[in-house]
UniProtKB/Swiss-Prot annotation:
InterPro entries found in the cross-reference section: RGS, RGS_sf, RGS_subdom1/3, RGS_subdomain_2
Its job: Inhibits G protein signaling in nervous system, interacting preferentially with the G(O) subfamily member goa-1. In vitro, protein acts as a GTPase activator of goa-1. Rgs-1 and rgs-2 redundantly adjust signaling when worms are fed to allow rapid induction of egg-laying behavior.
GO MF entries: GTPase activator activity
Protein name per the record: Regulator of G-protein signaling rgs-1
Compositional bias (Basic and acidic residues): 170-183
Organism: Caenorhabditis elegans
Pfam family, one: RGS
Gene assigned in the entry: rgs-1
Tissue-level expression: Expressed in most or all neurons.
Residues passing through the membrane, by range: none
Length: 201
């Protein structure tokens, strides 16, 4: 049986409330096609709640899950309409992720940190926009490539019966996988909404 720890375990440290990113988040019917698509780009991975959760588990193993928690908190702030609650959330985000006294401080350059400090004089939904963008790019550039070769991602793929594949997105390997599914008469979306595994022979 494949390793499915990413899906049943919690994020560890949770930000207040349920995080539903502002960007379009895809349906949660877990399938091989969904998990395999996470190789396409970091944007694709982050468009799935399950993708975010598995990536968060990976970051937690590297002691850097504050990055995705900060990003998610900023997304939550963007949706807040009540001005008083918005200011309170902005203050909490600052104390949790920006303050140099916080154990969860994210890594920002001096220019962006100065922008955040200035914005905090009158917090808005976009107070941390520059900081959020910088952390997103950091995760995409630094953590995402390692995630694709991590046990969290490989064993999630293995849970669908895929035990050997080029995690880098090798086109020839992908064509072979598609041809094998066609030979077995397995539709591309067979795993969606179903508990059946896609097995390779």
């Amino acid at each position: 049986m494949g390793y499915m720890g990413c899906w049943c375990s919690n994020l560890g440290r949770k930000y207040s409330g349920t995080v539903s990113p502002q960007r379009s988040v895809q349906p949660e019917a877990l399938s091989y096609e969904m998990v395999y698509s996470w190789q396409q780009s970091f944007d694709t991975l982050m468009s799935f709640k399950s993708g975010q959760k598995c990536f968060a588990e990976f970051l937690k193993s590297e002691y850097s899950d504050e990055n995705i928690l900060f990003w998610q908190a900023c997304e939550e702030l963007k949706r807040e309409k009540n001005s008083e609650k918005m200011e309170e959330k902005a203050r909490i985000i600052y104390e949790d992720f920006i303050s140099i006294l916080s154990p969860k401080e994210v890594s920002l350059d001096s220019k962006v940190r100065e922008i955040v400090n200035t914005n905090m004089s009158r917090p808005t939904q976009n107070t941390f926009e520059d900081a959020q963008h910088q952390i997103y790019q950091l995760m995409a550039r630094d953590s995402y490539p390692r995630f694709l070769t991590s046990i969290f991602y490989r064993e999630t793929l293995a849970s669908f019966g895929i035990t050997e594949m080029d995690i880098g997105g090798d086109e020839e390997k992908e064509r072979e996988q598609r041809a094998e599914r066609a030979r077995l008469n397995v539709p591309a979306t067979a795993a969606e909404g179903s508990s059946k595994d896609i097995s390779m022979v």
